């Protein structure tokens, strides 16, 4: 039986998490860290205890025990949500499809139009996710550099500063120019759709300008020891190399360093490999269109 997670499920939830179920969902802020699933109890217990419009969970129960769980979390806006956790008991991977199909009817709880899911490219859940209505629209690669060299910010004509709310339109124009149509259709063809679909990864964001226009967008995450960066730009190889060096300088003292790269950023991949990075993981990014409520027609008096 698949149903929502309730307050009365606290005990069986802790028992389920204590068995170290496999989490197939790969959210951006946990790509480079290992989380003990028992530590996931806090946000999941919170969803049991408090009614929240930013998170909800569904469980598959058999003989009184939880066999699988999917947790959904709101992105930046209410129109887009992501699968935050997809926990499966060992040997019960077949439950994945039914659980993900249930998310297609979650609009009664989350009022969303789109749902996003990131899986390891080799995950057994990938085919089942496609069977349940998800579409694979993008592959991402995670690059790894074990030891960073001491790098100072390079001299260039680029001007960097912290991202501000006033940059939203400029960043959307950059995203639109740099991303393929297939990706934009999934993540957002309009500023509102794109803005709502972005996740809430805790990063330091920098924009770089050239001739008064935003030419690059850097997302830098500082972990306790490791660091990660992402680059969105249309720049050529020379400026891309400068952006990589700039990111490494911003992550000075962090080891190892990771870079998340979209499959269409082939030039960036070559530059990373030239600088000693190795590809360590690949991820499938999927999206699913949820049922959209259509207002029921209402009869109104006809005026003479």
Regions found by a protein language model. Name each.
Residues 2-63, 132-225:
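Amide-forming acyltransferase catalytic core, primarily the GNAT-like/NAT-type
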Residues 58-98, 104:
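Long, hydrophobic/aromatic-enriched structural stretches that serve as scaffold segments
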Residues 91-107, 131, 236-250:
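Conserved acetyl-CoA-binding loop-helix of GNAT-fold acetyltransferases
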Residues 107-120, 252-263:
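Conserved GNAT acetyl-CoA-binding A-motif
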């Amino acid at each position: 039986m698949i149903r929502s997670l309730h307050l009365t499920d606290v005990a069986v939830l802790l028992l389920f998490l204590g068995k170290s179920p496999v989490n197939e969902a790969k959210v951006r802020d946990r790509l480079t860290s290992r989380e003990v699933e028992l530590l996931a109890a806090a946000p999941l217990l919170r969803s049991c205890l408090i009614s929240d419009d930013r998170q909800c969970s569904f469980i598959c129960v058999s003989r009184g025990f939880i066999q699988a769980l999917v947790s959904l979390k709101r992105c930046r806006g209410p129109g887009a949500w992501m699968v935050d956790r997809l926990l499966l008991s060992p040997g019960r991977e077949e439950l994945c499809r039914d659980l993900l199909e249930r998310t297609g009817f979650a609009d009664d709880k989350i009022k969303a139009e789109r749902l996003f899911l990131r899986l390891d490219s080799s995950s057994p859940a990938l085919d089942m996710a496609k069977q349940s209505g998800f579409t694979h629209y993008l592959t991402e690669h995670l690059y790894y550099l074990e030891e960073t060299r001491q790098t100072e910010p390079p001299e260039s004509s680029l001007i960097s500063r912290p991202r501000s709310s006033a940059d939203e339109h400029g960043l959307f124009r950059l995203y639109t120019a740099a991303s393929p149509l297939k990706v934009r259709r999934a993540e957002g063809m309009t500023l509102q759709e794109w803005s709502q679909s972005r996740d809430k990864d805790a990063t330091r964001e920098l924009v770089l300008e050239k001739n008064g226009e935003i030419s690059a967008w850097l997302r830098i995450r500082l972990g306790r020891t490791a660091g990660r960066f992402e680059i969105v730009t249309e720049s050529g190889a020379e400026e891309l190399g400068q952006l990589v060096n700039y990111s490494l300088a911003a992550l000075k003292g962090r080891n190892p360093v990771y870079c998340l790269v979209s499959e269409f950023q082939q030039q960036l991949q070559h530059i990373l490999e030239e600088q000693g990075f190795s590809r360590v993981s690949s991820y499938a990014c999927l999206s699913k269109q949820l049922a959209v409520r259509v207002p029921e027609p209402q009869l109104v008096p006809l005026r003479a």
